[in-house]
Amino acid sequence: MGAMDLVFKLIFGSKEQNDAKILKPIAEKTLTFEEEIKKLSNEELTNKTKEFRERVEKYIGCKTEELDLSKEENKKKLQNILDEILPEAFAVVREASIRTTGMRHFDVQVMGGAVLHQGRIAEMKTGEGKTLVATLAVYLNALTGLGVHVVTVNDYLAKRDAEWMTPIYSMLGISVGILDNTRPHSPERRAVYNCDVVYGTNNEFGFDYLRDNMVTRKEDKVQRKFYFAIVDEVDSILIDEARTPLIISGPAEKNIKMYYEIDRIIPMLKQAEVDERMREVAGTGDYVLDEKDKNVYLTEEGVHKVEKLLNVENLYGAQSSTIVHHVNQALKAHKVFKKDVDYMVTDGEVLIVDEFTGRVLEGRRYSDGLHQAIEAKEKVAIQNESQTYATITFQNYFRMYPKLSGMTGTAETEAEEFYKIYKLDVAVIPTNKPIARQDLSDRIYRTRKAKFEALAKYIKELQDAGKPALVGTVSVEMNEELSKVFKRHKINHEVLNAKNHSREAAIIAQAGEPGAVTLATNMAGRGTDIVLGGNPVAKGVAEIEQILVLMRDKAFKERDPYKKEELTKKIKSIDLYKEAFVRSVISGKIEEAKELAQKNNADEMIEKIDRIIQINEKAKVDKERVLAAGGLHVIGSERHEARRIDNQLRGRSGRQGDPGLSVFFLSLEDDLMRLFGGERVSKMMLAMGMGEEEELGHKWLNKSIENAQRKVEGRNFDIRKHLLEYDDVMNQQRMAVYGERDYILYSDDISPRVEEIISEVTEETIEDISGNKKNVDALEVTKWLNSYLIGIDEDAANKAVEGGVDNAVKNLTNLLLEAYRKKASEIDEKIFREVEKNIFLSIIDNRWKDHLFAMDSLREGIGLRGYAEKNPLTEYKLEGYKMFMATMNVIHNELVNLIMRVRIIPNSFDTIERESAFDGGVEEKSSASAMNGGNAQAIQSKVKNAQPNVKMAQKIGRNDPCPCGSGKKYKHCHGKDNPQ
């Protein structure tokens, strides 16, 4: 912090202090309603929701769903009335929470709820109850009836949070939906989105958006208009996953053998030496590896060597462009991506590991052939590459919400990015109790081996003293390596990583017990608190789960349909209220717990009351022991590139004012240290005669580590910002195409748009035929018209083109419009309008898919424009715009062509039910860049089957897209020498 910053802070106070000054009065005003709300009966409390909703609609003067939230004044109007209702509404939620869950919102939680409602990010430390905080903003905004989306990082948290908070919402008459595995476009899926609040993962929300923009019937859409989203672990979703696109794809035809052939030669290539500026030293090797940027590329010597090994004449020739791309991907697979760090191999499948959470990214695949290259490297079955049908990044998806907010324990270090990319301000919410955790200076050793030994000795001492410890690692590989060291030192410990993530909740529930040692990857129980002495609620819920296991088994075996249905209902009810039941027992409200069990016809739960009391009593005793021993000790085994991830690990300790301690054990051989000067420091230590086991500690060294992290964070921010600039080009095009699709889907009659397109196509074609001449060639016009099967002779064409170009455009437009209207009148208009819509949607979907592929190819090679002293981004925008306009031109020409030539067999349409393109075998996956799967033929056949029985003439029109796939009109391509 500079001198001016310090002066400014002293005069005006810190942002945190200023935020607290504004938010505190909101909490105080909420408190004034508490006594009044307490006196209400349950029914009166529920009726407050109806009262609030009436106030909202009266203020805005219309139904909320009629409000156009794209207009700033409407957004402001809605926000104003909700601000007015806020204190009383928050008091209502607080009372409902006390009555249903036994939890009362603290004043700081009320402040957090206000921040979320304001469309900002609430930074709240671990253990401050973010899940409960969300209920305040959710309820207030659910009063609009527009739907609130609560976005979580995984299915477990979505289900847990929804079930945990449902009793509160139910008491207040707010409906809750959970996005699980319900079938896309199903009535069940639509019913979930029609709920007042929907809990789900970022992937589920994003994929539903893409799927909704591939449907062929408006009835198949499941999402409503976007209104408000609250993103939990907002830094993880909006920053860590910002570069991750969601992609719906089908397979592309590729030669699998090529991956094996290229993989075979990679070990034969030698790494080149580089100077201090990462420039290759000529003649020293075949490829340059840049670990900082995670990049690798061939040297000139390497190019010649690969050409020789693969028997290719010119690696950069037109015929070999695919080969050089796959050679580069194979180099990355071998030299940049590491097993058990970036990915792991399980049951013959390559699974990506999230570098930020340590979890396996289920269903995700690297794109552009990288995943296939890794599969070849690991000698597992290679799956097909994919072709993109629809895609969007999380950055652009979440920016579509008129109102967006988020919560996390670590956002302040990324505040600049949140504001610049999403226009989201970060408010740091004070903790309910002061943080009592000690954050010690890093303990640094020369070698990795010395660090591990020192760490093991430290952990052994903690365990012997009955102190719980959480040890964080940055990868599965290090996690398993440290586990071996701990076993050698006879340290009892639990291992938590991507390979056994299913036990996460159970392991974290015990992580706060005396002497417990938990070795975890960066996931560190995100979303699951470590409670000192052990988590009695989690353990109590586990007891109820035992009942559910037996009941599910019984339901599975039950033959009587009636009994089976009753048992299934009972299981769902117990599952929904199990946590509320356990919390009631733990808080001493035994009668309330019994009442809850009896209400759900679950006497089996009552039988567990004594066991839950016993668990709670033991947890109390253990908690006192742990508190006396100094609380939870958190030990980091390596620094992450982002300070935020380190802070997340630290934040596991010292929750709710508990004592705790955090410290990092580092070595100069760690990746971050090695890449930012660790080798130089190591040489200094050797020169000073320091031994391998000696600890190195100095303020300047700690400062240099933080500076290294800042550099990496800054670079990653620049990369994300740069990628967004490119993606914004595609986003504008996507919005235009999806807007056209929506117009088609929601219009009963699209003839005005079709007539407009006929006029545009006619004008463009006549100008094309005439060139720069004043007159139009009647013969060319005749050929063009006959390609539409109009059946006009040359005399009629001569008459139509009399009077120059403008007159020709007018006459020919009228001629085509007359033919179009005549065609529509010859058959049932309703059938024709449906056929028309089907044809338009089919053309858009097919051409959009091709356009996405072309834009990917453009993006891949655009960087080379920099060598010609041109700005690649500017070039991408210009080229992308031209390509998009060309695609729209092709769509319009194809539409006119097909509409004018369509033949409908009578009585065929009503027997065919139009299907969604998504009923086929298309797969959707998110990826670290993309993914794979599906059946390309399936979607094409479904699009065709979606149309009525249509017969097309086989003649190729002059203005049709050339069948060769060039994207040019037929007359400018293979039709040049074939005037028809």
From Swiss-Prot:
Signal peptide: none annotated. The keyword ATP-binding applies. Its EC number is 7.4.2.8. One of its GO terms (cellular component) is plasma membrane. One of its GO terms (biological process) is protein transport by the Sec complex. It is found in: Cell inner membrane; Cytoplasm. Keywords: ATP-binding, Cell inner membrane, Cell membrane, Cytoplasm, Membrane, Metal-binding, Nucleotide-binding, Protein transport, Translocase, Translocation, Transport, Zinc. It catalyses: ATP + H2O + cellular proteinSide 1 = ADP + phosphate + cellular proteinSide 2. One of its GO terms (molecular function) is protein-exporting ATPase activity. ATP binds at residues 109, 127-131, 529. Its cofactor is Zn(2+). Residues 954-980 are annotated as: Disordered. Its main location: membrane. Zn(2+) binds at residues 962, 964, 973-974. InterPro entries: Helicase_ATP-bd, P-loop_NTPase, SEC_C_motif, SecA, SecA_DEAD, SecA_motor_DEAD, SecA_preprotein_X-link_dom, SecA_SF2_C. It is a peripheral membrane protein. May bind 1 zinc ion per subunit. HAMAP family: SecA. NCBIfam families: PRK12904.1, secA. Belongs to the SecA family. Part of the Sec protein translocase complex. Interacts with the SecYEG preprotein conducting channel. Has a central role in coupling the hydrolysis of ATP to the transfer of proteins into and across the cell membrane, serving as an ATP-driven molecular motor driving the stepwise translocation of polypeptide chains across the membrane. This is Protein translocase subunit SecA. It comes from Brachyspira hyodysenteriae (strain ATCC 49526 / WA1). The lineage of its organism: Bacteria, Pseudomonadati, Spirochaetota, Spirochaetia, Brachyspirales.
